[in-house]
């Protein structure tokens, strides 16, 4: 699959576009999402820059804010269907992971997550609008409430 991978810390030169990154395998408890939109946020920049406290294995596909369609569902997953429009909550508190940090993120064609990380996208909300909600919206909201 096509992806933008992080091979090391630094500026934009630390990012590499590849066309042959392995597709994620759908485990029995996983959902694979076909990425339709992703937005960049402060955490993606901190990860790329190597901010202390953010530990990742390289190469890593960054991108916390992801929206797309369900492409594959594990056998233990229920309540979701192929083609359903979803956004991904990047936090994975059950397994201690974070999309784009310990789990490959949305700067790729596909992203694998756990079902509890999925949120349905309501009718009338575009993929671009949905992909700005998980982290980018919270950052903007906090700034507006703090600074005014």
Regions found by a protein language model. Give the residues of each.
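Short polar catalytic/cofactor-binding loops
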Residues: 7-11, 38-40
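Glycine-rich beta-strand-centered segment in the early N-terminal region that forms part
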Residues: 22-39, 51-92, 122-125
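Short gly/ser/thr-rich secondary-structure transition/capping motifs
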Residues: 12-18, 51-52
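Extreme N-terminal starter segment of soluble prokaryotic enzymes
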Residues: 1-2
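Well-ordered beta-strand positions in beta-sheet-rich domains
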Residues: 17-20, 110
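NAD(P)H dinucleotide-binding glycine-rich loop of Rossmann-like/cofactor-binding domains
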Residues: 89-148
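Residue-level signal for short segments within beta-strands and strand-turn junctions
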Residues: 5-8, 49, 70
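Cytochrome P450 core scaffold surrounding the K-helix E-X-X-R motif
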Residues: 43-49
């Amino acid at each position: 699959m096509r992806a933008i991978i992080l091979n090391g810390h630094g500026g934009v030169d630390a990012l590499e576009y590849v066309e042959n990154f392995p597709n994620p395998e759908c485990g029995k408890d996983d959902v694979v999402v076909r990425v339709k939109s992703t937005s960049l946020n402060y955490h993606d920049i901190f990860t790329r820059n190597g901010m202390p406290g953010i530990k990742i294995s390289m190469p890593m596909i960054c991108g916390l804010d992801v929206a797309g369609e369900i492409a594959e569902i594990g056998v233990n997953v229920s309540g979701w269907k192929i083609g359903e429009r979803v956004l991904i909550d990047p936090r994975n508190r059950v397994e201690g992971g974070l999309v784009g940090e310990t789990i490959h993120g949305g700067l790729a064609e596909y992203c694998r997550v756990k079902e509890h990380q999925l949120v349905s996208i309501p009718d009338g909300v575009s993929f671009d609008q949905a992909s700005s909600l998980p982290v980018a919206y919270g950052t903007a909201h906090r700034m507006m409430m703090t600074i005014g």
